[in-house]
Each structure stands twice: as C-alpha cells, then as structure tokens.
C-alpha cells in the first residue's frame, strides 16, 4: 500500500507543490478547445500546444514521452515495457467557456485556495497530479513493478477517438484508470444512446408525455438496482414532427436490447428512429482487486467511508477492457463561489488545491 511511502510523498509535496500548481495554471492558460485540423495539428493549434507542453514537461522530469500522431501523448516511467501495464489517463482538451465568468476563463488564476480557469477541474489539474505521480517515482528512485504509463488525450470532450487510436496502436493495458471523476471510485458508467424520432404528423402531445417519462419506461429501457443504478431519459429538442432524446441506462440491459426496444416503440407509433450517438457502458465490482485497493486507499487517506458509484457521464474509462475512474474531484464539494460557478464545464471552473494534493498522494 502507498502508506509505506508516506514520508517520501509528503517531502516530495513540500518541494514540488508550488511548481505543480504553476504548471496547472500554465496549462489552463492554453485555450485548448478541440477544433478542426490545422496543418499537422489534428485537433487544432491550441490542442497541439497543450500536448507539447505536457510532453516537454515530462521529458524535463526524466520521463519518456511519445506523440501518437497528435491524437495524444504517452508518458512512461520506464523506457522498456514490463510485464503488467497500468495505464493512467487524462486529457488536455476543454469545453468552450460558458456563462458569466468573474475570472478570466483562460487566466489560470489562484485565489482562495483554488486554481480557477477552464479545464482546471476537467481535466488539467488531475492530469498534472498524474504526471507528478510518475515524476515522484523517478525522483525518489522507488520502482513500481508494473509498466506505469500516462495517456494524455486531446479529444475526450468530443468523441474520445483519441484514446481509441492510442489503444489500437499501443494495445489495451492490464488495467486502466481515468482521472476524470470524483473520488472515491467510479466503478461503472451507463450506456448512452442519443436518438431522434420522426413522425408524419404532429406529435406534441406524445412528446410531452415522453418528456415526463424521465426514466425511459415507455421506451423499454428502464431498470433500477443498487448495483447498476437507474435509467434516465431526457428530451433534448423537439418540434411538431420530431424529437431528440438522451438516454442513459444501466449495463444490466444490453445496449443492443435497448436499441431494439426503442425501435419497437417507434414502429408501434408509425415513426422512424435514427440513432445519433451510441456509447457502451461498463461495470466492474468495487470488490475486485484493484478497485478494492483504490477504495481502501481512499478511505485510509481521507477517513471518509464514501461508496463507489456509477456515473451517467462518459470518460476514457469506458474505453478500457478493464478499468475504472479514480478522482480527482471531491463529491458534493461546496465551493466558495456563487451558485452554479466553480464546477467542471461551468463558469469560473475551480480546482481545490488541497483536494488536488490529496489526489496526488493517493495516485
């Protein structure tokens, strides 16, 4: 367990905490909203700058780094492969600024114990914690037996084709950990289906009825359990003859069956259905080896007995054959900002520095 290295970890933080914070701020100042390809830069110049920043920093810290055709960067602790590979994953791309911001969205401001700016929470702060976790091993000479790597992506907020490309080239790890959630661990993500129903007549009454059915019961995708969570279905847009829906449902219902049930509903109502987005979810028991280890580590470090949870969002974790999410946010944190501010994707996105340092200790 990491407790064996408590002294080394805390001494490392004393030396490098301020440097880590400054590097998060510098990365936040790169407005890396993924865009169209520009020359050799697959996701635009700013995303390329963010990847280059991470690659350069990794090399400065004595780590090994490789650019995977601008889809992302792989950072390695060891030059040569080892038997078991543990892959950490985070991303540099961000969603565009939104809402009324008190602080410059790409300012990388430190105030009231927070790093403020777009991407500080999602996912540049956690990314730097992971990078410095690898640097810790290099700096102290502590040598994990596993082949420890970090994937730095640049298209997570769009479609996660970046990590798909990387995994196709590098292969699946023995276990993957995405740092794009809240602690303690995310041990599953729900299936995601976006779909559009089209009719030849006005269906406003039916749309209202389906909008009220927030659990997808009429579509035949409702399920609820303590283990896998509960289905949710939201009407995204509509007019008289069409409506678009965003469905999130547990992996206890195969995604193919969910599609079949939606198609059946459409047929019964003389409608056409078009699936706009499809992402298969995952589940791993928190009692399994690595998830259980991570959960115990979290509880020992924080003194909290929080439980593992299933999320409706989508992260790199669903792209692993086996893996989970682990931090770096604090669930239900009350931040000292106006209502609606401070969260990921919101105005004045703000990463709690103490929470980030605690994440680094656990990584």
What kind of feature is each model-predicted range?
Residues 64-68, 274-275, 309:
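Short beta-strand
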Residues 12, 304-362:
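Zn-dependent metallopeptidase/amidohydrolase metal-coordination segment
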Residues 155-157, 161-266, 279:
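Midchain, well-structured core segments that form catalytic/ion-binding scaffolds
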Residues 12-19, 23-30, 53, 57-61, ...:
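Generic non-transmembrane alpha-helical segments
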Residues 214-218, 225, 281-330:
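Active-site-adjacent substrate-binding region
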Residues 2-115, 144:
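Acidic/His- and Gly-rich active-site-bordering loop/insert found
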Residues 83-152, 341-342, 346-358:
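Active-site metal-coordination/substrate-binding segment of hydrolases
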């Amino acid at each position: 367990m990491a407790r064996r290295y408590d002294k080394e970890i805390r001494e490392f933080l004393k030396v490098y905490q301020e440097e880590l914070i400054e590097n998060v701020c510098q990365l936040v100042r790169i407005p890396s909203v993924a865009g169209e390809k520009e020359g050799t830069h697959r996701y635009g110049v700013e995303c390329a700058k963010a990847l280059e920043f991470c690659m350069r920093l990794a090399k400065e810290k004595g780590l090994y780094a490789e650019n995977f055709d601008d889809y992302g960067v792989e950072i390695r602790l060891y030059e040569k492969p080892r038997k078991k590979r543990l892959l950490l994953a985070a991303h540099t791309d961000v969603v565009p600024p939104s809402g009324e911001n008190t602080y410059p969205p790409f300012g990388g401001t430190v105030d009231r114990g927070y790093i403020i700016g777009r991407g500080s929470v999602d996912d540049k702060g956690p990314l730097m914690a992971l990078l410095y976790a690898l640097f810790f091993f290099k700096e102290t000479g502590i040598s994990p037996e596993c082949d420890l790597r970090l994937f730095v992506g640049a298209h997570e907020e769009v479609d996660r084709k970046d990590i798909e490309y990387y995994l196709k080239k590098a292969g699946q790890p023995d276990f993957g950990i995405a740092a794009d959630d809240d602690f303690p661990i995310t041990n599953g993500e729900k299936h995601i289906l976006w779909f559009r129903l089209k009719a030849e007549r006005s269906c406003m009454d039916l749309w209202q009825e389906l909008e009220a059915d927030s659990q997808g019961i009429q579509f035949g995708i409702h399920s609820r359990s303590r283990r896998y969570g509960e289905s949710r279905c939201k009407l995204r847009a509509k007019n008289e003859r069409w409506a678009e829906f965003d469905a999130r449902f547990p992996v206890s219902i195969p995604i193919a069956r969910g599609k079949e049930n939606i198609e059946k509903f459409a047929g019964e109502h003389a409608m056409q259905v078009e699936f706009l987005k499809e992402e298969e979810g995952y589940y791993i028991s928190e009692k399994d080896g690595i998830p259980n280890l991570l959960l115990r580590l979290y509880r020992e470090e924080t003194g909290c007995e929080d439980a593992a949870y299933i999320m409706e969002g989508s992260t790199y974790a669903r792209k692993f054959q086996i893996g989970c999410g682990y931090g770096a946010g604090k669930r239900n944190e009350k931040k000292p900002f106006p209502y609606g501010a401070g969260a990921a994707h919101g105005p004045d996105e703000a990463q709690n520095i103490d929470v980030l340092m605690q994440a680094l200790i656990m990584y």
